[in-house]
Amino acid sequence: NFQPIYRSVCRLAGKGDKRIGMIGGLPRLSSTKERIAAYQEAVADCGLPQDDLLIRYGNSMENSAQSCLDELLEQKCDALVVAQGLMASETVIYLHKKGLKLGEDIDLVTFVDYDSDINYLYSNQMDCIIQPVEKLGETAGELILQRIETPDAPAFEQVLTSTYQPCGM
């Protein structure tokens, strides 16, 4: 979660983007906290303005990104990082309806599933952070079964890696 967001924000800054907005998921989730921390660290390291108005939170459900997008576009963002797949789809549709062209009028980085339609259709116009969703589901199922079989076993953490894919790659 951390490294792909950090790299993507630094890449946007390197392209000349100055006001990079961030839409995170639910603030209480560890993945959201980690992604926001990566965004904030990258913004600071790249010498960009640190402005809380550039960070918004959706609820990771359908129709939760639109109000965030309205607010971020009012802040004159020239790039957006959307840290959740469903909100990413909504963002692409919203920007299209507003007449904004990805990669020209606004830069976009989104979390997507490897086989998502958004990744397939727009990977040449936006940066993608590809999540191994099948492996996430498989691993979660295995951990649940292990917990049922051995409820007193010590807890452990398994980290699966997302892949950062700059546009056109």
Q: What is the meaning of each model-derived region?
A:
Residues 1, 32, 84-85:
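Helix N-cap/beta->alpha junction signal
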Residues 1-22, 37, 62-69, 88, ...:
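Hydrophobic alpha-helical segments within soluble ligand-binding/sensing domains
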Residues 7-47, 152, 156-169:
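An alpha-beta-alpha
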Residues 16-21, 51-52, 71-79:
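Short, surface-exposed connector motifs at secondary-structure boundaries
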Residues 19, 50-54, 102-108:
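Short acidic capping loops at alpha-helix termini that bridge into adjacent secondary structure
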Residues 33-34, 67, 93:
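Generic recognition of short, well-ordered alpha-helical segments
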Residues 40-63:
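Short beta-strand elements in bilobed, periplasmic/extracellular small-molecule ligand-binding domains
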Residues 71-169:
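Flexible loop/turn connectors
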